[in-house]
UniProtKB/Swiss-Prot annotation:
GO MF: asparaginyl-tRNA synthase (glutamine-hydrolyzing) activity; ATP binding; glutaminyl-tRNA synthase (glutamine-hydrolyzing) activity
Physiological role: Allows the formation of correctly charged Asn-tRNA(Asn) or Gln-tRNA(Gln) through the transamidation of misacylated Asp-tRNA(Asn) or Glu-tRNA(Gln) in organisms which lack either or both of asparaginyl-tRNA or glutaminyl-tRNA synthetases. The reaction takes place in the presence of glutamine and ATP through an activated phospho-Asp-tRNA(Asn) or phospho-Glu-tRNA(Gln).
The protein's name in its UniProt record: Aspartyl/glutamyl-tRNA(Asn/Gln) amidotransferase subunit C
GO biological process: glutaminyl-tRNAGln biosynthesis via transamidation; regulation of translational fidelity; translation
InterPro entries per record: Asp/Glu-ADT_sf_sub_c, GatC
Family: Belongs to the GatC family.
Keywords: ATP-binding, Ligase, Nucleotide-binding, Protein biosynthesis
């Protein structure tokens, strides 16, 4: 049985910016241990004859030609922009 310690739960909670009381830490420790035990059952499967896959479905990317098309003019594109300069839309800074 995989045992997830209370310290491990507290560490993960800290990384996730979660505040857990002692009761919640105890409960999460038990639940996470049970989840890992359940997942470890996959190690018992014989997968020697299973071909490795990267995707469950056999889908492939369907690409189209990259062809230039007639689009709206730069003037029309900037017409509804609240602020623009030198042909480009200006937006508020998000970095300090």
């Amino acid at each position: 049985m995989a045992e997830i310690s209370k310290d491990q739960v507290k560490h993960v909670a800290h990384l996730a910016r979660l505040e857990l009381d002692d009761e919640a830490v105890e409960k999460m420790s038990d639940e996470l241990s049970a989840i890992i035990d359940f997942a470890e059952q996959l190690n018992e499967l014989d997968t020697d004859s299973v071909e490795p896959t990267t995707h469950v479905l056999n889908l492939k990317n369907v690409m189209r030609k990259d062809e230039p098309k007639k689009w709206i003019s730069q003037e029309d594109a900037l017409r509804n922009a609240p602020d623009h300069k030198d042909g480009q839309i200006r937006v508020p800074s998000i970095l300090e």
